[in-house]
Amino acid sequence: MKKILAVIGLLFLMVACSSTEEVKSSGSREKIYRTSTNQTTVRNIGKFQVDSSTYISRGKEERIKFIILHYTALDNVGSIRELTGGVSAHFLVLDEDDNKIYSLVPLEQRAWHAGVSAFRGRTNINDTSVGIEIVNDGIAKEYRSDPNPYHPYDHYVDYKPIQIEKVAQIIKYVAEKYNIPARNIVAHSDIAPSRKKDPGAKFPWKELYDKYNI
């Protein structure tokens, strides 16, 4: 009988060790949440092991909150040159009928696309956004010398359907990955209205909604 009880006790301990535990820190009323020891993942820093799963902090959030759309106001060559220099974006969609989307900056890193910006109580939107640059002239060249800063719809350049399809797929991928709501998928002109117009009056926001459910 003693052997049976000992076995039952051992099984109980094994089950307890395989589940999430709530540990009270000594001398404090705070609670520490600890995950299973048998699910621990370990890597090394120098000669020391780093345990990244036994104790998990709940005080965290995703960096990426917004998706910002831009036009480059340059041709393909100029856009590539500009966006591989000091200015950058996470994705570049060229003015070409092909199946390529260019990733210029990894999503986990910050790109320099927003500039001085603010939106929904946040500033410096580079810190919390993914930037998508689309090769498009923006304002047609014959109207760029117009001193009036406000251009009518006809002054803007159309986007190619393939570009919009690519942009839609990027948005859907990033929004799903980081749980970004539609209200946070915005124009450069939304976060810097006093100095930016892109992606311009001819960017088909309604098409994104109607055709791609964005």
Regions found by a protein language model. Give the residues of each.
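Intrinsically disordered, low-complexity segments enriched in Ser/Pro/Gly/Ala and basic residues
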Residues: 17-18, 24-27, 35, 51-52
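Active-site-adjacent loop/helix surface patches within enzyme catalytic domains
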Residues: 31-179
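Sec-dependent signal peptide recognition
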Residues: 2-10
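Generic cytosolic/nucleocytoplasmic N-terminal low-complexity/intrinsically disordered segments
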Residues: 1-2, 23, 46
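Basic/polar, cationic surfaces and motifs that engage anionic cell-wall
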Residues: 18-25, 143-214
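Generic surface-pattern signal
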Residues: 6, 85, 210-213
